[in-house]
Swiss-Prot record:
Catalyzes the deamination of 5-methylthioadenosine and S-adenosyl-L-homocysteine into 5-methylthioinosine and S-inosyl-L-homocysteine, respectively. Is also able to deaminate adenosine. It catalyses: S-adenosyl-L-homocysteine + H2O + H(+) = S-inosyl-L-homocysteine + NH4(+); S-methyl-5'-thioadenosine + H2O + H(+) = S-methyl-5'-thioinosine + NH4(+). It comes from the Archaea. Keywords: Hydrolase, Metal-binding, Zinc. Its EC number is 3.5.4.28, 3.5.4.31. One of its GO terms (molecular function) is 5'-methylthioadenosine deaminase activity. Gene3D superfamilies: Metal-dependent hydrolases, Urease, subunit C, domain 1. This is 5-methylthioadenosine/S-adenosylhomocysteine deaminase. Zn(2+) binds at residues 60, 62, 208, 296. Binds 1 zinc ion per subunit. The gene is mtaD.
Amino acid sequence: MSILIKNGHVIYGENLDVVRADVLIESNRIVSVERNINEAADTVIDATGRVVSPGFINLHTHSPMGLLRGLADDLPLMEWLQNHIWPREAKLTPEYVKVGAYLGALEMIRSGTTTFLDMYFHMDKVAEAVLDAGLRGYLSYGMIDLGDPDRTEKELKEALREMEAIEKLNSERVHFVFGPHAPYTCSIALLKEVRKLASEHNKLITIHVSETMAEIGQITERYGKSPVVLLDDIGFLGNDVIIAHGVWLDSRDIQILARHGVTVAHNPGSNMKLASGVMPLEKLLNAGVNIGLGTDGSASNNNLDMLEEMKLAALLHKVHNLDPTIADARTVFRMATQNGAKALRLNAGIIKEGYLADIAIINFNRPHLRPINDVISHLVYSANGNDVETTIVDGKILMLDGEVLTLDEEKVISEAEKVSEKLA
């Protein structure tokens, strides 16, 4: 299978050079980026007036939570979770989660996301949806034991069961990740065992850390130290760890994260909506910490649009620091592409020969994207997910000219509505 993308504005290489060029894809790799490629291809896409971008990498989400979108808004995090989200999640069956995963996958395909790091439950069912949709999914079962030893054993058993189920799929696009929920919901015993298992099985770890001031207070009262120091003291951290949020980090925390090569997944939309706080982006970047971008779940955002998330990230840090030079467009664009790929150890996030063919083609023949003075600026400040026209993952076209090819869109939406009624 080969694809030739003709006449596009291509965002090329690590430096984000915008060049007028063609892109040739063979199998699942980009093999050539140059002008006037004349080789025959199975599919030819005319990208005149379009931007050919790396696909976006959502480094923290809970994709099935689209089922809960709009059910509880304008509330503090713990009230939102305990009184509204967790009670409804208790009603979720494996099949309901799968329906939610299809809805999330459809939304991501439509907005140019090609890879996502997910945390939820019944992840073997999510994996089935990811395979059908054609996306790349890094899937973690969210483990919570609340200090109960019996529950610790149960959670570890379930994580290993889901790991085995996902590995049996034998797909290069679907990967299991260990996902202890957070230091305030997980015992030290659980965290230590996760660290051991991740090393044994060569898996990544993702965990919510320092999201709210309430969490900081709870952990400090319980252990006499910050969540990051706690994780460092028990030997949990490493360059295979991706922490979500990292809002309330002091200078010591930041140095610890930098020393271990930990990635932080920034979720500006969710952090603003839940009034959690503002991640110290500049301090983290200056310390050399890898920062990716995530939407969080679409019940706390309330969508999975990475183009919108880039704009939120850029604007949040400018106004918070009263400095318009902070979180410039190129820095934020890298967070949504290259940096996410680095965290996932994925040869993607860049359009260049030899890289995986994970691509979003954005239609710039729109009034809000003209004139084309600066492509990266337009993507960060002017574009939105509805401008994405074609999505390619692993050399396969998932959406072409606005038509999703891998999923029955009407069926996905109809099934989601039916499940939502049962959860209300």
